[in-house]
Amino acid sequence: MRKKGGYKMSRYYYSIYGALIKQFIESKRIFGYKYAMVEQECARFDKYAYDNDEKVIGISKELAIQWCAKRPNESVKTRRNRVQIIRAFSAYLCCIGYPSHVPQIPHAKSMFIPYIFSKDEVEKIFVASNFLRPAENNPNSAVFAIPCLFRLLYGTGIRINEALHLLCKDVNLKDNHIVLRDNKNGRDRIVPISDSLAIVCEEYLKHSEQYRINYNSERFFIKPNGKPFGSEAAYKWFRKLIYEAGISYQGRGIGPRLHDFRHTFSVHTLASMAENGLDMYYSLPILSAYLGHQSVASTDKYVRLTAEMFPLILQKTNELFPYLFPEIYKR
């Protein structure tokens, strides 16, 4: 029976699961997860349980199926995220003594194939970036930051927005690492950088110092007027550079995209680890943690390999993690 009225969507919970939801969220935050989106979704589940007058703690299979059912106009990604949350909560309930049904995550079919730059193409992009110049009518162009920015994207695999939101205090050139704060998964993480990349960052920092003195800018990547710039500006220069490097742009939704620096970093890193004799059983979890993913499965969309480029790596990966890259195996 559904209860009518009396329910207010907020951080307060009213169902039989209320106190346990709070414990669940706090248990995640202890490990650095902000869990803001999860908190909202848990509030919706709490309302659902309250409206359905749930009396016994423990998510039944029937309740899980009802909650996880696809909703009108709901995208595959949104539904998967919603199911992942209730799945995690059900697993938590099981761990603390309340048997619950742990639903399966809906299978997502993806035709997305990233563009993987060859090392030669990456080098051509970097060389071309060294010759970029601002237009005469736009002295405050972000162009002077682009050579360092793109090398950082390829050299670390971080996302463009993570790079553009770096503060000077987040770039540690003494110990060669950067700190990403409040990133996509709601937690801070430290990302090491190579000696050569640290030198590039140091040269850029020295070059930009004059602008920081004049405008008191805290952001690491800035324009000559001291102001930060967005991903749109970075993407504009990216399109220009791939043209200068002789790399064909195949259209919207196909690429190459700026985010493909992240995909390329992942593939090249796997290749390097394999060439150095590191077993794929160890290298995939290492890469997954480095990229800020919570599981090896999450690394799927970032490290798709093509049999043409890395057949040996693909074979090793398939043997250890079957179906991790299913769309490639079916070709």
Language model segments and positions:
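Conserved catalytic core of the tyrosine transesterase superfamily
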Residues: R2-R331
